[in-house]
């Protein structure tokens, strides 16, 4: 695997190399080959991965068809003491368990 180093910018080249390795699945492969995996464990892991993929695909399909609500986008910018989307009753005693 090769990456070009432009203008002696090693940090950028390392970042590009890491991205390529991630895309190729090298890190995952290294993790899997770090120790011996019994054939029965491998079979169970692959089966679980297939189930996970199928569920994810079905969830995405339902979201596209509008039968399942989309994941809420994270809200940024609510700093310390700011309104964090708790509605009009935000403040004293408005926690999830009521007043303490």
Swiss-Prot record:
Record-annotated membrane-spanning stretches: none
* Domain of life of the organism encoding this protein: Bacteria
What are the GO cellular component annotations? ribonucleoprotein complex; ribosome
Keyword Cell inner membrane annotated: no
Tell me one GO biological process term: translation
Q: Which InterPro entries match?
A: Ribosomal_bS21, Ribosomal_bS21_CS, Ribosomal_bS21_sf
Under PROSITE patterns, the record lists: RIBOSOMAL_S21
The annotated region (Disordered) lies at: 61-100
What Gene Ontology molecular-function terms does this entry list? structural constituent of ribosome
Family matches, as Pfam families: Ribosomal_S21
Question: Any idea which UniProt keywords this protein has?
Answer: Ribonucleoprotein, Ribosomal protein
Q: Which residues form a coiled coil?
A: none
The entry sums up its family as follows: Belongs to the bacterial ribosomal protein bS21 family.
Q: Which PANTHER family match?
A: MITOCHONDRIAL 28S RIBOSOMAL PROTEIN S21, SMALL RIBOSOMAL SUBUNIT PROTEIN BS21M
- NCBIfam families referenced in this protein's UniProt entry, alphabetically: S21p (TIGR00030)
State the protein's name. Answer: Small ribosomal subunit protein bS21
The scientific name of the source species is Rhodopseudomonas palustris (strain BisB18)
